[in-house]
Swiss-Prot record:
Gene from which this protein is expressed: rplP
Xref: SUPFAM superfamilies: Ribosomal protein L16p/L10e (SSF54686)
Protein name listed in UniProt: Large ribosomal subunit protein uL16
Chain intervals for the UniProt region annotation (Disordered): 1-26
Any single biological process term in GO: translation
Molecular function terms, GO-annotated: rRNA binding; structural constituent of ribosome; tRNA binding
Similarity comment: Belongs to the universal ribosomal protein uL16 family.
Any one GO CC term of the record: cytosolic large ribosomal subunit
Organism: Macrococcus caseolyticus (strain JCSC5402) (Macrococcoides caseolyticum)
Keyword entries, A-Z: Ribonucleoprotein, Ribosomal protein, RNA-binding, rRNA-binding, tRNA-binding
NCBIfam families documented for this protein: rplP_bact
InterPro entries recorded: Ribosomal_uL16, Ribosomal_uL16_bact-type, Ribosomal_uL16_CS, Ribosomal_uL16_dom, Ribosomal_uL16_sf
Length: 144
């Protein structure tokens, strides 16, 4: 599972999930991508589960890039504990995903295989997603 090697502070405030993603909105490494259309926290377990679903369907063919990383800790207080007396212990790590963010990319497989692999991965995630292709740069070149 993914988690940071070390952090400066163990606990953080909850991150905002409003607005659209500022970066990571284009397919950069692979040919096809899985883009979030809603906002959510995605845990390291969900990322790993989606990765396993994709690689199993592709039968170890092609290459997968994970473009999100769970940097943010989330905390939880024990059951039946009264409010107050500090923030709870770190329960796990999450990646904050906003609409427009490309979460996974795939290359080296046909489009049908990539579409199905990303569909299987999307079932493991708490966000609505859509399949996107890389937009090739070209055609409109300035030759002066």
């Amino acid at each position: 599972m993914l988690l940071p090697k070390r952090v400066k502070y163990r606990r953080q405030h909850r991150p905002k999930t409003t607005g659209r993603s500022k970066g990571g909105n284009e397919v950069t490494f692979g040919e096809y991508g899985l883009q979030a259309t809603t906002a959510a926290w995605i845990t390291s377990r969900q990322i790993e589960s989606a990765r396993i679903a994709m690689t199993r369907y592709m039968k170890r063919g092609g290459k997968v890039w994970i473009k999100i990383f769970p940097h943010t800790p989330y905390t939880k207080k024990p059951l039946e504990v009264r409010m107050g007396s500090g923030k709870g212990a770190v329960e796990g790590w999450v990646a904050v995903v906003k609409p427009g963010r490309i979460m996974f990319e795939i290359a080296g497989v046909p489009e049908e295989v990539a579409r199905e692999a990303l569909r299987l991965a999307s079932h493991k995630l708490p966000v609505k997603t859509k399949f996107v292709k890389r937009e090739e740069l070209g055609g409109d070149t300035n030759e002066s």
